[in-house]
């Protein structure tokens, strides 16, 4: 049990929102956090496509399977970016977006992990060097693992989507 004083020493209330409705505030904040996290899966590196980066590293000799995987991530990233824009427009128009943040957060973090996995694999064992030619790539790749925990784990996001978006039973 945690005890929080009702007021600070300067007399300002410690209560955010309504008393005994703290979970409502927490859910709102998590939704906001998830929306921000979801954007990470839609970015490209320095404005260049994943396929272009990987092709350069392979000296133009990227195999077709790897090229197809890179293009799938790029196409999925574009689809998520467009979906995020649609939900943003809906929110600005005063329409509810439901539990879209859970879906977008899950898809965004998974795409981010896929993108970094491909970039690591294209660099071979050299990409694992912490201070090597690939710069922050190893740290960025490891960071993607934390993204799937922030704002609610991927498993929690899948549970929210299955129950509240798709209406599936527990």
Predicted regions and their residues:
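Short, glycine-/Ser/Thr-/acidic-enriched flexible segments
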Residues: 2, 9-11, 108, 154-155, ...
